[in-house]
Amino acid sequence: MSSKDKKLSKPTSGRTGGIRTLSDLNRRSEPDSDSDSDGPQEYFTGGEKSGMLVQDPTKEPKHDDVDEIFNQARQLGAVEGPLEHPSSSRSFTGTGRLLSGESVPTALQQPEPVIHNIIFWSNGFTVDDGPLRKLDDPENASFLDSIRKSECPKELEPVDKRAPVHVNLMRRDEKCPEKEKLKVSFQGVGRTLGGASSSTASSQSNLTDVAAVQSPLQSLVVDETLPSTSIQLRLADGTRMVAKFNNHHTVNDIRGFIEFSRPGNPNNYTLQVMGFPPKPLTDPSQTIEQAGLASSVVIQKF
């Protein structure tokens, strides 16, 4: 993360249940400070390329590890103010044309910021809409160490290195709510009662045909023991969502996730990785690792 910190304006919203900020940590170290505050404050650390918004809950902290993360983020330059996204330039952009008729190329467009939300619960933490992760899991040690250092974890780094990354840190007292399990309707091979059995080769062919028409989402199971990543999806209808995949999942799995979330919509769309210029994803069998899609932004285009 950039070492240049920007101080932002104080939020105007009142105190909300379950949220406490780093200003409360500061008050505990200042005995003369007034106990009545105007409401919650937020702290943002980062500069042109990265940012971190830090919040802390209203009750006394229960987990030393989480306290350490928030305290170190404050010590490494967290400043008061809400997270603000870099405003887009209002200057004219486009292709110019000289009086002689020659075209003048426009300047390179800066990529949009990639935003990730990390919530610390009483029983672990979540990244965006991903599953609950444990603080004492050795596989999460490197991730949490980066947060302590006010750095962007490697798994959240965007494909386009020019894109700024904003990591929002929040803390809640309650346990992470359980997500509803996905129900998948039965799919398989039927056999007519009393019908003649087919040959082994024909049976294998039928099984292959059924497997080919099954929804890609049925096989989309994220294995927490394998390398995984979060991908931000921007759909053609303006919806933005974050989905977690294993690195061995394919472009076709991403399409299956989109089509399951938007049943009935036409599937004659293309996917492309946000960048300049955008990179089309034309090979549905290509894995996320092969396509370099880890922590990327994928756009749906009709």
Swiss-Prot record:
Residues 113-177 form the SEP domain. It comes from Arabidopsis thaliana. Residues 1-64, 79-98 are annotated as: Disordered. Interacts with CDC48A. One of its GO terms (cellular component) is cytosol. Keywords: Ubl conjugation pathway. Residues 224-301 form the UBX domain. This is Plant UBX domain-containing protein 3. The keyword Magnesium does not apply. SMART domains: SEP, UBX. The keyword Lyase does not apply.
